[in-house]
Amino acid sequence: MMKRLLCVLLSTSVFSSPMLGYSASKKDSKADICLAVSSGDQEVSQEDLLKEVSRGFSRVAAKATPGVVYIENFPKTGNQAIASPGNKRGFQENPFDYFNDEFFNRFFGLPSHREQQRPQQRDAVRGTGFIVSEDGYVVTNHHVVEDAGKIHVTLHDGQKYTAKIVGLDPKTDLAVIKIQAEKLPFLTFGNSDQLQIGDWAIAIGNPFGLQATVTVGVISAKGRNQLHIVDFEDFIQTDAAINPGNSGGPLLNINGQVIGVNTAIVSGSGGYIGIGFAIPSLMAKRVIDQLISDGQVTRGFLGVTLQPIDSELATCYKLEKVYGALVTDVVKGSPAEKAGLRQEDVIVAYNGKEVESLSALRNAISLMMPGTRVVLKIVREGKTIEIPVTVTQIPTEDGVSALQKMGVRVQNITPEICKKLGLAADTRGILVVAVEAGSPAASAGVAPGQLILAVNRQRVASVEELNQVLKNSKGENVLLMVSQGDVVRFIVLKSDE
């Protein structure tokens, strides 16, 4: 059976991997491309209807394509490993090779067996972007312009520009760059929340360097998460053909509006097999607006660790159906603690909107500006109550950055990860996702798959708690208590400060 492989859609001079983006037009052309199904009492033949559908796609392509651009990123260093959201350059040391599982390798941020067999050098990263303002703001994926040296942008008419980075957001894999030009054609955003399964979807991009390629499919699913591509996931799934080089390009509706930014595919070979993922336009636009105005993204913070609800938990906590998110821990001093949230509360709605999944709630809170008041509907001991909470700014990641400087990448552990690793569902700790070869962490014995249980003799159960501990111990060596299997050990990471 073909093994599943998550790919981001990048194209390089030696190797291609998938990515996505989006674009806009000067005017909303909705009225121009509506399909004429009937005219008065006159019946429309099947042939005429098909012609109208075809013309509709043609009109979208004609109006949107001028707003889609070809991006070439010449990184600061020429010889680099293949970049992707799940495979950060230079992070190696996989103790789990015996699983022989491509998805497992991707999850741990490691090169797949296929990638290890390919040349690991490149001269340029090539992808797609789309213009969102007439004065030259361009949206693409973060992984297209990551580690940028020179960025070249080629318009549909062949004009070439050098671009500068305006803002990056690796947590959603979005980026904004800018070219010095005026009166450009640009794309507008549609409402991704209004999408229905089966709606038409049109992708425009530069697969394998073939510029202005248009493909058509449908919306296959919404709200895809737990793919471990980026931190905040709420992907639209489509069968519109997306291939290496499409990264950062737009996914459009039949009105020519951007409903998503193409980002990744599932594939056994690195190419298209009918499953592609796009960042929904509502999430993308909120991130993009902040990148353009501030150069960075400010996210809301509640201060809870959550667990998905399954049918057994729904019965145990007397829920009317399988929905909501279970609070497994409350961060000390957080908005959640101050508002009175407790361990084992089940959050079933926020501001009147039902919590369909843990990821949906997490994404919604993260998109709220600090100071936003949100009313949480809680099921506690079988009773329903409402608790108002004022969201604050998500804590800085100084602690995580300190670990990254030492060569370690971490993430919160989830029930899905526990299942994958054969751990108990209630396992607490922080998962080591990857370790950079030759780093202080690698030399000290830190390895992917280990669980960090304590830092500087303080128990930690979330990345937020890790941040707080490390922020209070700047300039000091870091003492980690880690476990792997039944073995617990202590590791000292020496600080450079």
From Swiss-Prot:
Residues 1-16 form the signal peptide. It is found in: Periplasm. GO terms for molecular function: serine-type endopeptidase activity. SMART domains: PDZ. One of its GO terms (cellular component) is outer membrane-bounded periplasmic space. Transmembrane segments: none annotated. The active site is at H143, D173, S247. Disulfide bonds: none annotated. Keywords: Hydrolase, Periplasm, Protease, Repeat, Serine protease, Signal, Stress response. It catalyses: Acts on substrates that are at least partially unfolded. The cleavage site P1 residue is normally between a pair of hydrophobic residues, such as Val-|-Val. Its EC number is 3.4.21.107. Pfam families: PDZ_2, PDZ_6, Trypsin_2. Substrate binds at G245, N246, S247, L302, G303, V304, T305, L306. Its main location: periplasm. Residues 290-381, 394-485 form the PDZ domain. One of its GO terms (biological process) is proteolysis. PROSITE patterns: PDZ. Coiled coil: none annotated. Residues 128-289 are annotated as: Serine protease. Might be efficient in the degradation of transiently denatured and unfolded proteins which accumulate in the periplasm following stress conditions. Belongs to the peptidase S1C family. NCBIfam families: degP_htrA_DO. PANTHER family: SERINE PROTEASE FAMILY S1C HTRA-RELATED, SERINE PROTEASE HTRA2, MITOCHONDRIAL. This is Probable periplasmic serine endoprotease DegP-like. It comes from Chlamydia trachomatis serovar D (strain ATCC VR-885 / DSM 19411 / UW-3/Cx). The gene is htrA.
